[in-house]
């Protein structure tokens, strides 16, 4: 696996906020300035922050602070959209291991911005309230060591599968030993029949991904409802990496509803060098993954 280049900014984080902003037209791009104080006890520690569209679950920003500075500081987050509500998660890496650990090992908090209406400043209040935010992998097309809670490599195809879920969303990473398309299907009944299939390819730096379903043993078709929340992919040195997120239960009759803690049958396939989704696989296999439960 390759190491991901992380955008480094000076930013700050909090557990609550107050928003006093004017009203502008819906859908306009805005910038929010987070203004932070009272973080001196954490000076020198690392913070991670992400901003998520509360309605669609699309992550719109993810930032890393390598060292929290002493004194007051601020960060601009943009572009956000008017008329949109956001969930803001952050944690302070108190034990310095570079990864998220549930409180009280790390300090983690969550707050919401409801119906953002304009650019403006947010007064962030740092308090002692902690929340297990279950920090998820970044859907950026690069799978890094330890990014996902679970990982396996399928011996039949050579595809490495990475996964992590919360109560609502499943996040998947795939590393394929080829430059063609790669696919994964959940819940097959007979070969491809009944499977909820995601197939993706990266060509000239552009990811193409489709939500399909298996209608027969060897036939799959495009789903009329695309239920992928977010996706990204990269290709380098003869290897294709794809990451995506989707709802465990989308409500789409062509999707298989998944349940936390469930062991799910999985089909895997790839083409060694063709990005055409009509090209027959050069390798395929079946396996199973067990989703996170108790969440």
Residue ranges: model-predicted function:
Residues 48-52, 87-91, 183-185:
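Beta-strand signatures of extracellular beta-sandwich domains
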Residues 136-295:
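Extracellular-facing/secreted segment signature in eukaryotic proteins
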């Amino acid at each position: 696996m390759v190491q991901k280049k992380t955008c480094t900014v000076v930013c700050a984080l909090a557990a609550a906020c107050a928003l006093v902003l004017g009203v502008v037209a819906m859908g306009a791009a805005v910038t929010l300035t987070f203004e932070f104080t009272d973080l001196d006890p954490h000076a020198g520690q690392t913070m991670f922050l992400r901003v998520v569209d509360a309605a669609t679950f699309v992550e719109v920003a993810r930032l890393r602070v390598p060292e929290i500075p002493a004194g007051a500081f601020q960060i601009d987050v943009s572009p956000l959209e008017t008329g949109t509500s956001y969930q803001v998660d952050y944690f302070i890496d108190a034990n310095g291991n570079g990864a998220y650990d549930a409180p009280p090992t790390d300090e983690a908090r969550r707050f919401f911005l409801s119906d953002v209406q304009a650019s403006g400043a947010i007064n962030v209040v740092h308090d002692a309230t902690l929340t297990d935010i279950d920090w998820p992998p970044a859907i950026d097309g690069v799978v890094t060591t330890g990014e996902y809670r679970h990982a396996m490599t399928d011996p039949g195809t050579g595809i490495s599968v990475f996964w992590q879920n919360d109560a609502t969303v499943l996040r998947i990473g795939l590393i394929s030993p080829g430059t063609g398309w790669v696919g994964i299907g959940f819940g097959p009944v007979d070969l491809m029949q009944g499977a909820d299939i995601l197939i993706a390819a990266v060509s000239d730096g552009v990811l193409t991904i489709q939500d399909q379903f298996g209608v027969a043993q060897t036939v799959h078709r495009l789903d009329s409802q695309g239920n992928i929340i977010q996706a990204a992919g990269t290709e380098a040195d003869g290897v294709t990496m794809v990451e995506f997120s989707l709802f465990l239960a989308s409500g789409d009759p062509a999707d298989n509803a998944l349940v936390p803690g469930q062991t799910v049958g999985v089909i895997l396939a790839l083409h060694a060098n063709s990005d055409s989704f009509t090209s027959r696989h050069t390798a395929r296999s079946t396996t199973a993954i067990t989703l996170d439960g108790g969440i």
